[in-house]
Amino acid sequence: MAEKALLVCFGGMSNVGTLTGLAALELARAGEATIFCLASLANGDPVVKKRLEEAERIVAVDGCPLACARRIAERAGFPPHRSLVLSRDLGIAKGPPMAVGEEDVPRAVELIREALKVEAWANGEIP
């Protein structure tokens, strides 16, 4: 089965950056998606590139509007099928790295989970 790839910008320099990593880890632990190394993609790693070529879906998850994950993916030749920006999509103000609200993790997980659903994509439910 082809992987559902998550490209996550988890720099940990803000609460929304930290949130991207926490939510992605939860989905990876549940076997719902695979987190790909964004730095390896930026460095042109052939293994990461091959796996992304074979991925069923690619979702970029960024914390803030700088959209580093999406931009790195696009520059590497892998435009994501969906691009999420947690600060925008969940209405969370960017703040210090440790200021992640416990209530925000399940909200982020659900947003990413919906973006990964092939059915939602086919029906045009995910913008």
Set out the residue ranges of the language-model regions.
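Iron-sulfur-associated redox domains of electron-transfer enzymes in respiratory
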Residues: 1-127
